[in-house]
Amino acid sequence: LSGLDTSEATSMSDMFNYCTSLTSLDVSGFDTSQVKKMDRMFRFCEKLTELDVSNFSGASLENAYFMFQDCKALETLNLGSFSPAKATNLQGMFVGCKSLKSLDLSRFSTTSATDMTMMFHGCSSLKTLDLTSFDTANVTCTNAMFYGCSALEVLDLGSFDLSSAGDVTNMFGSCSSLRTIYAANSFAIPEGAYSNNMFSGCTSLVGGSGTAYDAAHVDAEYARVDRGATAPGYLAGKMGDVNGNGRLNAVDAQIAYDIATTTFYQDRPDYAAMFARADVTGAPGGGPDGQVTANDAFAIQYAALRGWGA
């Protein structure tokens, strides 16, 4: 496709839809600067193992729903700086990409998105997912957004604002390995939103103050930062907010350093929660690694200086 001129194309909907035997695809020469629609573009490209769309522009993009649906063999997806900042519908964008082990969304803007239904549904090999670039202020539906992400262990939703959401049904359903969901202390689901089975099957989930998964509480009732027995929840305070007071500052960095180098805090009843919030880095590709070191303290200090606090 190296000679294909797409400079005036406005729609690429269904372009490779149902190319079920396609094993390789080079779209590096595509000019997508005028393209408004990419819905179902690579849908059911079941044998593709890698795809590079890092050259794609999302400047004009309005719809990207089911763009990579059921690319079942896809192990590597390079999005580069591709960002659907103007797109409103991201429904099922990566649904069924069950072989993806990682996905770099660090430059992925969602400022206009209103629908994230099933966005990562069935991405059963994803172990980590960095969504810190996401803006969800306008999102009304996250139904089954992470459903079946059974390898996912930690999820940082610190940037998520679901105050406009009307449907969060099955949002984390069957995320059986999910241990920790980080969120801003202000995180809340609007009263009246549909939330049936929001946490159903999240059998490994533990809130920041130790509240363990209970099959009797799987709706939005526990979709809040865990405050223990008085206000149980399945979420943990924002990563780096070590003392859990809703602010990220130099005090948190100092506590993290003390945890790393002394035994000063180990007798406190909230030590486990503090340890979890201090463990912000160290794993391959970023994220918590089960240890607190001086590097965690330095990372928290840097975040505080940059004003990234809750």
Describe the residue ranges of each PLM region.
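Negatively charged
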Residues: 1-238
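Cellulosome-associated attachment modules in secreted, modular CAZymes
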Residues: 235-310
